[in-house]
Protein backbone atom coordinates (compact mmCIF):
# COMPACT_ATOMS: atom_id res chain seq x y z
CA UNK A 1 0.00 0.00 0.00
CA UNK A 2 1.19 3.49 -0.81
CA UNK A 3 -0.34 5.18 2.24
CA UNK A 4 1.58 3.80 5.19
CA UNK A 5 1.00 4.71 8.82
CA UNK A 6 3.85 7.16 8.37
CA UNK A 7 2.30 9.05 5.45
CA UNK A 8 2.72 12.83 5.67
CA UNK A 9 -0.77 14.31 5.96
CA UNK A 10 -2.83 17.20 7.22
CA UNK A 11 -1.21 20.07 9.07
CA UNK A 12 2.27 18.52 8.87
CA UNK A 13 2.00 18.24 5.09
CA UNK A 14 0.83 21.85 4.83
CA UNK A 15 3.71 23.07 6.98
CA UNK A 16 6.29 21.27 4.85
CA UNK A 17 4.60 22.60 1.69
CA UNK A 18 4.66 26.13 3.14
CA UNK A 19 8.35 25.68 3.95
CA UNK A 20 9.21 24.56 0.42
CA UNK A 21 7.19 27.44 -1.05
CA UNK A 22 9.03 29.96 1.12
CA UNK A 23 12.40 28.52 0.06
CA UNK A 24 11.47 28.85 -3.62
CA UNK A 25 9.84 32.27 -3.41
CA UNK A 26 12.65 34.83 -3.53
CA UNK A 27 13.20 38.18 -5.19
CA UNK A 28 13.14 36.83 -8.74
CA UNK A 29 9.80 35.16 -8.09
CA UNK A 30 8.43 38.49 -6.92
CA UNK A 31 9.75 40.36 -9.94
CA UNK A 32 9.03 38.12 -12.94
CA UNK A 33 5.19 37.78 -12.72
CA UNK A 34 4.40 41.52 -12.34
CA UNK A 35 6.71 42.36 -15.24
CA UNK A 36 5.03 39.69 -17.34
CA UNK A 37 1.65 41.17 -16.46
CA UNK A 38 2.76 44.69 -17.37
CA UNK A 39 4.28 43.57 -20.68
CA UNK A 40 1.53 41.12 -21.69
CA UNK A 41 -1.36 43.50 -21.08
CA UNK A 42 -4.62 42.07 -22.41
CA UNK A 43 -2.79 38.85 -23.38
CA UNK A 44 -1.84 38.42 -19.73
CA UNK A 45 -3.64 35.17 -18.92
CA UNK A 46 -2.52 33.35 -22.06
CA UNK A 47 1.06 34.35 -21.21
CA UNK A 48 0.51 33.28 -17.61
CA UNK A 49 -0.41 29.73 -18.67
CA UNK A 50 2.93 29.41 -20.47
CA UNK A 51 4.76 30.98 -17.55
CA UNK A 52 3.20 28.52 -15.11
CA UNK A 53 4.31 25.54 -17.20
CA UNK A 54 8.00 26.44 -16.98
CA UNK A 55 8.16 28.48 -13.74
CA UNK A 56 6.05 26.05 -11.68
CA UNK A 57 5.90 22.79 -13.61
CA UNK A 58 9.67 22.41 -14.05
CA UNK A 59 10.64 23.14 -10.41
CA UNK A 60 7.96 20.86 -8.97
CA UNK A 61 9.02 18.14 -11.40
CA UNK A 62 12.56 18.74 -10.12
CA UNK A 63 11.45 18.23 -6.51
CA UNK A 64 9.71 14.99 -7.51
CA UNK A 65 12.70 13.77 -9.55
CA UNK A 66 15.14 14.32 -6.69
CA UNK A 67 12.74 12.62 -4.26
CA UNK A 68 12.30 9.60 -6.55
CA UNK A 69 16.05 9.25 -7.08
CA UNK A 70 16.97 9.75 -3.43
CA UNK A 71 18.83 13.06 -3.75
CA UNK A 72 20.69 15.11 -6.34
CA UNK A 73 23.91 13.02 -6.18
CA UNK A 74 21.85 9.87 -6.79
CA UNK A 75 19.95 11.48 -9.69
CA UNK A 76 23.12 12.75 -11.38
CA UNK A 77 24.83 9.47 -10.49
CA UNK A 78 22.64 7.72 -13.04
CA UNK A 79 25.01 9.27 -15.60
CA UNK A 80 28.29 8.50 -13.77
CA UNK A 81 29.49 8.85 -10.15
CA UNK A 82 32.24 11.30 -11.07
CA UNK A 83 29.81 13.39 -13.13
CA UNK A 84 27.43 13.40 -10.17
CA UNK A 85 30.02 14.91 -7.84
CA UNK A 86 31.14 17.61 -10.29
CA UNK A 87 27.59 18.49 -11.34
CA UNK A 88 26.26 18.65 -7.77
CA UNK A 89 29.13 20.90 -6.64
CA UNK A 90 28.52 23.23 -9.60
CA UNK A 91 24.78 23.37 -8.90
CA UNK A 92 25.15 24.04 -5.18
CA UNK A 93 27.87 26.67 -5.60
CA UNK A 94 26.50 28.49 -8.64
CA UNK A 95 22.95 28.87 -7.40
CA UNK A 96 24.03 29.27 -3.77
CA UNK A 97 26.94 31.37 -2.49
CA UNK A 98 28.06 32.42 -5.98
CA UNK A 99 24.71 33.88 -7.05
CA UNK A 100 21.43 33.60 -5.22
CA UNK A 101 22.54 33.86 -1.58
CA UNK A 102 24.44 37.17 -1.90
CA UNK A 103 21.69 38.55 -4.14
CA UNK A 104 19.07 37.97 -1.45
CA UNK A 105 20.75 40.66 0.66
CA UNK A 106 21.62 43.09 -2.13
CA UNK A 107 18.15 42.91 -3.74
CA UNK A 108 16.22 43.31 -0.50
CA UNK A 109 18.46 46.23 0.52
CA UNK A 110 17.67 47.92 -2.82
CA UNK A 111 13.98 47.88 -1.88
CA UNK A 112 14.82 49.54 1.44
CA UNK A 113 16.84 52.42 -0.03
CA UNK A 114 13.78 54.66 -0.68
CA UNK A 115 13.11 54.45 3.07
CA UNK A 116 16.60 54.48 4.62
CA UNK A 117 18.77 55.99 1.88
CA UNK A 118 21.76 54.46 0.12
CA UNK A 119 25.20 54.19 1.72
CA UNK A 120 28.05 51.70 1.74
CA UNK A 121 27.98 51.52 5.53
CA UNK A 122 24.21 51.06 5.55
CA UNK A 123 24.44 48.17 3.08
CA UNK A 124 27.22 46.54 5.10
CA UNK A 125 25.31 46.78 8.38
CA UNK A 126 22.13 45.50 6.74
CA UNK A 127 23.89 42.52 5.17
CA UNK A 128 25.65 41.77 8.48
CA UNK A 129 22.33 41.60 10.34
CA UNK A 130 20.63 39.80 7.42
CA UNK A 131 23.19 37.00 7.09
CA UNK A 132 23.70 36.63 10.84
CA UNK A 133 19.97 36.11 11.31
CA UNK A 134 19.79 33.76 8.31
CA UNK A 135 22.70 31.72 9.68
CA UNK A 136 21.09 31.23 13.08
CA UNK A 137 17.75 30.23 11.53
CA UNK A 138 19.53 27.81 9.16
CA UNK A 139 21.59 26.35 12.02
CA UNK A 140 18.87 23.74 12.60
CA UNK A 141 17.82 22.77 9.05
CA UNK A 142 15.39 20.16 10.37
CA UNK A 143 13.47 22.96 12.15
CA UNK A 144 12.69 25.05 9.06
CA UNK A 145 9.04 23.97 9.11
CA UNK A 146 8.74 25.68 12.50
CA UNK A 147 10.54 28.86 11.47
CA UNK A 148 9.72 29.35 7.79
CA UNK A 149 6.57 27.27 7.34
CA UNK A 150 4.83 28.28 10.56
CA UNK A 151 5.91 31.94 10.93
CA UNK A 152 7.61 33.67 8.01
CA UNK A 153 5.69 32.11 5.13
CA UNK A 154 2.24 33.07 6.51
CA UNK A 155 3.53 36.59 7.22
CA UNK A 156 4.73 36.90 3.62
CA UNK A 157 1.41 35.62 2.24
CA UNK A 158 -0.57 38.10 4.36
CA UNK A 159 1.48 41.04 3.03
CA UNK A 160 1.08 39.91 -0.60
CA UNK A 161 -2.69 39.49 -0.09
CA UNK A 162 -2.87 43.04 1.35
CA UNK A 163 -1.19 44.40 -1.79
CA UNK A 164 -3.48 42.32 -4.02
CA UNK A 165 -6.59 43.40 -2.09
CA UNK A 166 -5.59 47.04 -2.48
CA UNK A 167 -5.24 46.47 -6.21
CA UNK A 168 -8.74 44.94 -6.37
CA UNK A 169 -10.49 47.47 -4.14
CA UNK A 170 -8.74 50.58 -5.50
CA UNK A 171 -7.62 49.62 -9.02
CA UNK A 172 -5.17 52.10 -10.50
CA UNK A 173 -6.55 51.34 -13.98
CA UNK A 174 -9.83 50.00 -15.34
CA UNK A 175 -8.17 47.14 -17.22
CA UNK A 176 -4.96 45.79 -18.68
CA UNK A 177 -2.78 47.67 -21.14
CA UNK A 178 -1.69 46.95 -24.71
CA UNK A 179 0.60 43.91 -25.02
CA UNK A 180 4.10 44.33 -26.39
CA UNK A 181 4.86 42.77 -29.77
CA UNK A 182 6.24 39.50 -28.37
CA UNK A 183 3.20 38.90 -26.18
CA UNK A 184 0.72 40.00 -28.83
CA UNK A 185 2.11 37.46 -31.31
CA UNK A 186 2.62 34.34 -29.17
CA UNK A 187 1.71 35.08 -25.54
CA UNK A 188 1.88 31.49 -24.22
CA UNK A 189 5.23 30.82 -25.91
CA UNK A 190 6.67 34.05 -24.52
CA UNK A 191 5.35 33.11 -21.09
CA UNK A 192 7.19 29.77 -21.28
CA UNK A 193 10.40 31.62 -22.13
CA UNK A 194 9.92 34.00 -19.19
CA UNK A 195 9.29 31.13 -16.79
CA UNK A 196 12.37 29.30 -18.04
CA UNK A 197 14.48 32.33 -17.09
CA UNK A 198 13.63 31.91 -13.39
CA UNK A 199 15.88 28.79 -13.37
CA UNK A 200 13.95 27.49 -10.36
CA UNK A 201 14.41 23.88 -11.46
CA UNK A 202 18.01 24.20 -10.26
CA UNK A 203 16.79 25.43 -6.87
CA UNK A 204 14.50 22.40 -6.76
CA UNK A 205 17.52 20.12 -7.07
CA UNK A 206 19.07 21.95 -4.09
CA UNK A 207 16.16 21.78 -1.68
CA UNK A 208 15.36 18.06 -1.68
CA UNK A 209 17.70 17.02 1.15
CA UNK A 210 16.53 19.77 3.53
CA UNK A 211 12.85 19.02 2.87
CA UNK A 212 13.55 15.34 3.58
CA UNK A 213 15.18 16.34 6.92
CA UNK A 214 12.09 18.33 7.89
CA UNK A 215 9.80 15.43 7.01
CA UNK A 216 11.93 13.10 9.14
CA UNK A 217 11.79 15.66 11.98
CA UNK A 218 7.98 15.26 12.21
CA UNK A 219 8.33 11.49 12.67
CA UNK A 220 8.32 10.18 9.08
CA UNK A 221 11.33 7.89 8.87
CA UNK A 222 10.49 5.25 6.24
CA UNK A 223 12.42 6.06 3.08
CA UNK A 224 9.44 5.51 0.77
CA UNK A 225 7.20 7.65 3.00
CA UNK A 226 9.77 10.47 2.97
CA UNK A 227 9.88 10.33 -0.83
CA UNK A 228 6.10 10.45 -1.13
CA UNK A 229 5.92 13.23 1.46
CA UNK A 230 8.47 15.30 -0.46
CA UNK A 231 6.47 14.93 -3.67
CA UNK A 232 3.22 15.87 -1.92
CA UNK A 233 4.87 18.89 -0.32
CA UNK A 234 6.11 19.85 -3.78
CA UNK A 235 2.54 19.76 -5.10
CA UNK A 236 1.39 21.97 -2.20
CA UNK A 237 4.21 24.44 -2.91
CA UNK A 238 3.34 24.38 -6.62
CA UNK A 239 -0.30 25.20 -5.88
CA UNK A 240 0.77 28.09 -3.67
CA UNK A 241 3.13 29.39 -6.35
CA UNK A 242 0.30 29.23 -8.88
CA UNK A 243 -2.04 31.33 -6.72
CA UNK A 244 0.61 33.89 -5.69
CA UNK A 245 1.97 34.20 -9.24
CA UNK A 246 -1.58 34.80 -10.50
CA UNK A 247 -2.08 37.60 -7.97
CA UNK A 248 1.25 39.21 -8.86
CA UNK A 249 0.58 38.91 -12.58
CA UNK A 250 -2.78 40.67 -12.18
CA UNK A 251 -1.08 43.37 -10.09
CA UNK A 252 1.46 43.81 -12.89
CA UNK A 253 -1.25 44.03 -15.54
CA UNK A 254 -3.04 46.83 -13.68
CA UNK A 255 0.20 48.62 -12.81
CA UNK A 256 1.44 48.39 -16.41
CA UNK A 257 -1.73 50.06 -17.65
CA UNK A 258 -1.68 52.78 -14.98
CA UNK A 259 2.07 53.44 -14.97
CA UNK A 260 3.49 52.60 -18.41
CA UNK A 261 7.21 52.75 -18.96
CA UNK A 262 8.35 50.67 -15.97
CA UNK A 263 11.31 48.62 -17.22
CA UNK A 264 11.62 46.06 -14.38
CA UNK A 265 9.31 44.01 -12.23
CA UNK A 266 10.49 45.86 -9.13
CA UNK A 267 9.59 49.19 -10.77
CA UNK A 268 6.13 47.83 -11.68
CA UNK A 269 5.47 46.82 -8.06
CA UNK A 270 6.94 50.02 -6.62
CA UNK A 271 4.77 52.23 -8.84
CA UNK A 272 1.59 50.41 -7.83
CA UNK A 273 2.38 50.17 -4.10
CA UNK A 274 3.26 53.86 -3.99
CA UNK A 275 0.15 54.78 -5.98
CA UNK A 276 -2.14 52.76 -3.72
CA UNK A 277 -0.69 53.39 -0.27
CA UNK A 278 1.95 56.11 -0.56
CA UNK A 279 4.84 55.74 1.89
CA UNK A 280 3.02 52.90 3.66
CA UNK A 281 3.09 51.08 0.33
CA UNK A 282 6.86 51.45 0.18
CA UNK A 283 7.13 49.92 3.66
CA UNK A 284 4.76 47.11 2.66
CA UNK A 285 6.73 46.29 -0.48
CA UNK A 286 10.08 46.46 1.34
CA UNK A 287 8.76 44.04 3.98
CA UNK A 288 7.59 41.63 1.26
CA UNK A 289 11.01 41.66 -0.39
CA UNK A 290 12.95 41.33 2.87
CA UNK A 291 10.91 38.35 4.09
CA UNK A 292 10.93 36.61 0.69
CA UNK A 293 14.67 37.08 0.28
CA UNK A 294 15.36 36.02 3.86
CA UNK A 295 13.37 32.80 3.46
CA UNK A 296 15.24 31.88 0.28
CA UNK A 297 18.58 32.76 1.88
CA UNK A 298 17.89 30.47 4.83
CA UNK A 299 16.80 27.64 2.55
CA UNK A 300 19.89 27.94 0.37
CA UNK A 301 22.35 28.18 3.28
CA UNK A 302 20.76 25.07 4.82
CA UNK A 303 20.78 23.16 1.52
CA UNK A 304 24.36 24.05 0.59
CA UNK A 305 25.54 23.41 4.15
CA UNK A 306 23.89 19.97 4.26
CA UNK A 307 25.36 18.93 0.92
CA UNK A 308 28.93 19.95 1.73
CA UNK A 309 28.67 18.42 5.21
CA UNK A 310 27.77 15.10 3.55
CA UNK A 311 30.57 15.57 1.03
CA UNK A 312 33.13 16.59 3.68
CA UNK A 313 31.92 14.94 6.92
CA UNK A 314 35.02 16.04 8.85
CA UNK A 315 33.72 19.61 8.63
CA UNK A 316 30.74 20.32 10.88
CA UNK A 317 27.49 21.62 9.41
CA UNK A 318 27.58 24.83 11.55
CA UNK A 319 31.12 25.62 10.34
CA UNK A 320 30.19 25.10 6.68
CA UNK A 321 27.00 27.16 7.01
CA UNK A 322 28.95 29.96 8.72
CA UNK A 323 31.57 29.91 5.96
CA UNK A 324 28.99 30.25 3.19
CA UNK A 325 27.04 32.94 5.08
CA UNK A 326 30.25 34.95 5.56
CA UNK A 327 31.32 34.40 1.94
CA UNK A 328 27.89 35.56 0.72
CA UNK A 329 28.00 38.66 2.92
CA UNK A 330 31.38 39.64 1.50
CA UNK A 331 30.24 39.07 -2.09
CA UNK A 332 27.06 41.07 -1.49
CA UNK A 333 29.21 44.05 -0.46
CA UNK A 334 32.40 43.94 -2.51
CA UNK A 335 32.45 41.43 -5.33
CA UNK A 336 28.99 40.47 -6.56
CA UNK A 337 29.35 41.90 -10.08
CA UNK A 338 32.57 39.97 -10.70
CA UNK A 339 31.24 36.69 -9.38
CA UNK A 340 28.02 37.08 -11.39
CA UNK A 341 30.06 37.38 -14.58
CA UNK A 342 31.31 33.85 -13.87
CA UNK A 343 28.35 32.18 -12.17
CA UNK A 344 25.62 33.27 -14.62
CA UNK A 345 27.30 31.62 -17.66
CA UNK A 346 27.87 28.49 -15.56
CA UNK A 347 24.17 28.49 -14.65
CA UNK A 348 23.21 28.87 -18.31
CA UNK A 349 25.50 25.94 -19.14
CA UNK A 350 24.20 23.53 -16.49
CA UNK A 351 20.48 24.44 -16.45
CA UNK A 352 19.64 22.47 -19.63
CA UNK A 353 21.54 19.48 -18.21
CA UNK A 354 19.41 19.69 -15.05
CA UNK A 355 16.23 19.70 -17.14
CA UNK A 356 17.34 16.60 -19.04
CA UNK A 357 18.13 14.79 -15.78
CA UNK A 358 14.63 15.64 -14.53
CA UNK A 359 12.99 14.58 -17.81
CA UNK A 360 14.79 11.24 -18.12
CA UNK A 361 13.92 10.40 -14.49
CA UNK A 362 10.25 10.37 -15.54
CA UNK A 363 10.72 8.09 -18.53
CA UNK A 364 9.36 4.54 -18.08
CA UNK A 365 11.98 2.39 -16.35
CA UNK A 366 12.56 0.22 -19.41
CA UNK A 367 13.78 3.35 -21.25
CA UNK A 368 16.13 4.48 -18.47
CA UNK A 369 19.16 2.70 -19.87
CA UNK A 370 22.64 3.96 -18.95
CA UNK A 371 23.22 5.15 -22.53
CA UNK A 372 20.00 7.19 -22.47
CA UNK A 373 21.23 9.07 -19.40
CA UNK A 374 24.77 9.48 -20.66
CA UNK A 375 24.07 10.44 -24.27
CA UNK A 376 21.16 12.70 -23.30
CA UNK A 377 23.41 14.64 -20.92
CA UNK A 378 26.44 14.53 -23.25
CA UNK A 379 24.59 15.87 -26.31
CA UNK A 380 22.92 18.55 -24.17
CA UNK A 381 26.26 19.63 -22.70
CA UNK A 382 27.88 19.75 -26.15
CA UNK A 383 25.44 22.55 -27.01
CA UNK A 384 24.77 24.27 -23.68
CA UNK A 385 28.39 24.67 -22.54
CA UNK A 386 29.78 26.27 -25.73
CA UNK A 387 26.66 28.45 -26.00
CA UNK A 388 27.01 29.80 -22.47
CA UNK A 389 30.80 30.05 -22.24
CA UNK A 390 33.33 31.59 -24.69
CA UNK A 391 34.37 28.75 -27.00
CA UNK A 392 35.21 30.78 -30.13
CA UNK A 393 33.91 29.40 -33.46
CA UNK A 394 32.29 26.42 -31.72
CA UNK A 395 30.05 28.79 -29.76
CA UNK A 396 28.96 30.44 -33.00
CA UNK A 397 28.07 27.07 -34.52
CA UNK A 398 26.11 25.92 -31.48
CA UNK A 399 24.22 29.21 -31.35
CA UNK A 400 23.12 28.62 -34.96
CA UNK A 401 21.16 25.47 -34.03
CA UNK A 402 17.32 25.56 -34.14
CA UNK A 403 15.70 27.40 -31.21
CA UNK A 404 19.06 28.84 -30.05
CA UNK A 405 17.72 32.37 -30.34
CA UNK A 406 15.06 31.45 -27.78
CA UNK A 407 17.52 29.79 -25.42
CA UNK A 408 16.51 26.25 -26.37
CA UNK A 409 19.29 25.34 -28.79
CA UNK A 410 20.12 22.38 -26.53
CA UNK A 411 16.73 20.74 -27.07
CA UNK A 412 17.38 19.12 -30.47
CA UNK A 413 20.80 17.69 -29.48
CA UNK A 414 19.27 16.38 -26.24
CA UNK A 415 16.50 14.58 -28.11
CA UNK A 416 19.03 13.15 -30.58
CA UNK A 417 21.21 11.88 -27.71
CA UNK A 418 18.25 10.28 -25.92
CA UNK A 419 17.06 8.76 -29.21
CA UNK A 420 20.46 7.20 -29.91
CA UNK A 421 20.56 5.86 -26.35
CA UNK A 422 17.18 4.20 -26.85
CA UNK A 423 18.19 2.59 -30.15
CA UNK A 424 21.65 1.28 -29.19
Task: Label the predicted regions.
Residues 9-20, 45, 81-95, 124-129, ...:
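Select transmembrane alpha-helical segments in multipass membrane proteins
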Residues 57, 61, 155-167, 231-256, ...:
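Selective recognition of specific alpha-helical transmembrane segments in multi-pass small-molecule
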Residues 35, 69, 82-117, 293-310, ...:
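Hydrophobic transmembrane alpha-helices that form the core helical bundles
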Residues 15-25, 166-173, 182-248, 284-293, ...:
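Hydrophobic, membrane-embedded alpha-helices of multi-pass small-molecule transporters
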Residues 67-74, 131-152, 217-220, 329-342, ...:
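Membrane-water interface regions at transmembrane-helix termini and the short interhelical loops
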Amino acid sequence: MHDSAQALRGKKLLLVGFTLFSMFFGAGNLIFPPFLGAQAGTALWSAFVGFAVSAIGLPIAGVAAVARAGGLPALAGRVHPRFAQVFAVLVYLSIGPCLAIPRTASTSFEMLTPLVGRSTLGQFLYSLVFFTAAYFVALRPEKLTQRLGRILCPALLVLIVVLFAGCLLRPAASGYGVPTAAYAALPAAQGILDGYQTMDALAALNFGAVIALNIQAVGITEEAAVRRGTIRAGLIAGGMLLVVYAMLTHIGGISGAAFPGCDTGAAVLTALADGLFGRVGQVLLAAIFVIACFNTCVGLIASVGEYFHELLPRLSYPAIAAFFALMSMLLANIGLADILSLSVPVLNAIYPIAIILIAVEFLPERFQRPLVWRLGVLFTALQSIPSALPFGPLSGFMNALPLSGLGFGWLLPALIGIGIGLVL
